[in-house]
Amino acid sequence: MSRDPLPFFPPLYLGGPEITTENCEREPIHIPGSIQPHGALLTADGHSGEVLQMSLNAATFLGQEPTVLRGQTLAALLPEQWPALQAALPPGCPDALQYRATLDWPAAGHLSLTVHRVGELLILEFEPTEAWDSTGPHALRNAMFALESAPNLRALAEVATQTVRELTGFDRVMLYKFAPDATGEVIAEARREGLHAFLGHRFPASDIPAQARALYTRHLLRLTADTRAAAVPLDPVLNPQTNAPTPLGGAVLRATSPMHMQYLRNMGVGSSLSVSVVVGGQLWGLIACHHQTPYVLPPDLRTTLEYLGRLLSLQVQVKEAADVAAFRQSLREHHARVALAAAHSLSPHDTLSDPALDLLGLMRAGGLILRFEGRWQTLGEVPPAPAVDALLAWLETQPGALVQTDALGQLWPAGADLAPSAAGLLAISVGEGWSECLVWLRPELRLEVAWGGATPDQAKDDLGPRHSFDTYLEEKRGYAEPWHPGEIEEAQDLRDTLTGALGERLSVIRDLNRALTQSNAEWRQYGFVISHHMQEPVRLISQFAELLTRQPRAQDGSPDSPQTERITGFLLRETSRLRSLTQDLHTYTALLSAPPPVRRPTPLGRVVDDVLQDLEPRIADTGASIEVAPELPVIAADAGLLRDLLLHLIGNALTFGGPEPRIAVRTERQGAGWSIAVSDQGAGIAPEYQERIFLLFQRLGSLDEALGNGLGLPLCRKIAELHGGTLTVESAPGEGSTFRCWLPDAGPLPGAADA
């Protein structure tokens, strides 16, 4: 089980420490054990309705002392509301779900009742209420139209702050936007005349600690009615059923952190209210409202503000998406040019560095590093070469396929000195890891930030809330212009485009290189042995021809001795051998550079019949018997090449099958193709030679003892590979051999309909 790296301290009422700026992120603000005094709070068992806890001021609002309330049931206390309350808040419902009612209470007049459930606990809040101005709903309707009509985010922020101030009457209303580092900036402000302006000011993250931001994300409205009012404890302070603090994160009456109360008083604020702006599940910002005097906003108006906050959240999401879409639209044609060039490129370096593509302008960058196939080159203003090497080495340590920052020195401290040309970085990987990548760089911008009284570092110096909120100007170094969200999305899409396009082209190049390497090796082997194997028959023919010229002849010129007859027979055999070798060499060299064959439906039985007819004299001479399966399939193949393959395989079986060879030709369906097996019962082949026989001119035994020319089986394997298939042998000494050629099916084949 994972453990929170910053666990909460126990609350002060359980012996926890005093909260300071150094430990405020660990303050348990959701379990204060007390409430604000402008209302009363009860907790009750979610099943029985038994009252478990009450605020010590309950008698002021409910007319009953805690000792009287404790142990009562909600059915007795709220007989009219209890059934509806149970139905509205069933067990397991979200804690954001509420039950609302207005009570006519003898002790306090009209009370607003708000109830929510936290696990097995019901939390009931009672506040005095009065009729809301009837113009309120109309004002909300008008506000909705105004928000929807705002043309951009800046206008939307201004409309929101002005509308909230008109609805509520707060002295100051700000829209406060969080940055990625959790600092916040006031991007819009509506204020009473005479108040100091905070528009454009930035505030450190410590002003709203992490646990407060998390609470604002879950519960959208927070009210501090009086920054000088004392909190009212719960009685008992712990839930008597669990002996644990009661979670009040969703209660509007929850007591405010003493640290935050002092912070507000130091600002001269008498009351405050905030409404969360949550976009995509993340806390985007706050509508922050300040009043110089205590101010209890009526519950109905608070609900209206919560609706307004939700609408603003949706409009922010819409406006930001529209801004990104408009930005992306301006890049679409540029992206298309890059994609088209990459798709037709065999040299990524040369193509992507072409000034006509303007990859620098695509991302509004000052410099670009292109890294492909172990080398890099640059465009525009970039750091010196050693720094580029170091930057690329650092990138290789980064996870993911996209890295972006507007402050490289913060992400990579060693890169701080590169700020003049590389304060900002946007990098995409277009290969495996970062071996192939594009890295855009932006130069440093000298920025002047207006802080609302203290920089983040200064805010850490005091143990208590700061007192000064005067404007403090800070020059920020090491920052570049932030990358627009549209640029980041564009980089991601460009990565996908280039990864696909370059991946295909690089794969083609690598395949071609491998094929070329293999082909060169085969040609070198061919050149090395061809002279010997071609010269041997020629040498023998020459020698025997010379002997023949020395033999006596009859008057009619015919041989007149057995020796002459033997020489003549030898010449004929060697001439035949030379002819066979020449034909096989011609076929093999043609296949080395041949395109994939055109595969048509080919009846295998017809091809086997043709081969056996060609081999009929040899079959008769050897006394061989050949068994052919009765039904052979139609195979997707080049008929001529398939015939050559079977001619060699069956011919091999005749040569090496022993006396009176017994040969079998069979087929079987294997996966998405057919296996053709040619078997003999000859001497067999030892395992260590079973791959060697498929190499060029490799024959078992010495040259004088071995049969064949050493080209037949390599030729057969090449034919199989050109069809996308394989050729293997199964054999053992003394047990014969089976050569298996597997040929895959093809897609729709030419002439398939007529087969």
UniProtKB/Swiss-Prot annotation:
User: What InterPro entries does the record point to?
Assistant: GAF, GAF-like_dom_sf, HATPase_C_sf, His_kinase_dom, HisK_dim/P_sf, Light-responsive_reg, PAS-like_dom_sf, PAS_2
Histidine kinase domain: which residues?
Answer: 529-747
| Entry EC no(s) | 2.7.13.3
Look up the domain of life of the source. Answer: Bacteria
Which amino acid positions bind a tetrapyrrole, per UniProt? Answer: C24
The answer, when asked if Phosphoprotein is one of the entry's keywords, is yes
A Pfam family name for this chain? GAF
Entries under Gene3D superfamilies matching the protein: 3.30.450.270, 3.30.450.40, Histidine kinase-like ATPase, C-terminal domain, PAS domain
| Catalytic activity from the UniProt record | ATP + protein L-histidine = ADP + protein N-phospho-L-histidine
Q: Which GO terms describe its biological process?
A: detection of visible light; osmosensory signaling via phosphorelay pathway; regulation of DNA-templated transcription
Per UniProt, which keywords does this protein have?
ATP-binding, Chromophore, Kinase, Nucleotide-binding, Phosphoprotein, Photoreceptor protein, Receptor, Sensory transduction, Transferase
Summarize the PTM comment: Contains one covalently linked tetrapyrrole chromophore. Lacks the cysteine conserved in plant phytochromes (at the position of Met-259) that binds chromophore. An engineered sequence used for X-ray crystallography forms a thioether link to biliverdin through Cys-24. The natural sequence can bind phycocyanobilin and phytochromobilin in vitro, but the identity of the natural chromophore is unknown.
Q: Which residues form the PAS domain?
A: 26-94
Describe the effect of M259C: Binds PCB (in vitro), but difference spectrum is altered
Q: Which residues form the GAF domain?
A: 152-316
The reported result of mutating M259A is: Binds PCB (in vitro), but difference spectrum is altered
Q: Where is this region: Chromophore binding domain?
A: 95-504
A molecular function (GO) term = phosphorelay sensor kinase activity
- Phosphohistidine modifications at: H532
User: Which family does this protein fall into?
Assistant: In the N-terminal section; belongs to the phytochrome family.
Q: Tell me, what does this protein do in biology?
A: Photoreceptor which exists in two forms that are reversibly interconvertible by light: the R form that absorbs maximally in the red region of the spectrum and the FR form that absorbs maximally in the far-red region. Also has a slight blue shift for the far-red maximum. Could also absorb green light. May participate in regulating pigment synthesis like the carotenoid deinoxanthin which could protect the bacterium from intense visible light.
Q: Could you tell me what this protein is called?
A: Bacteriophytochrome
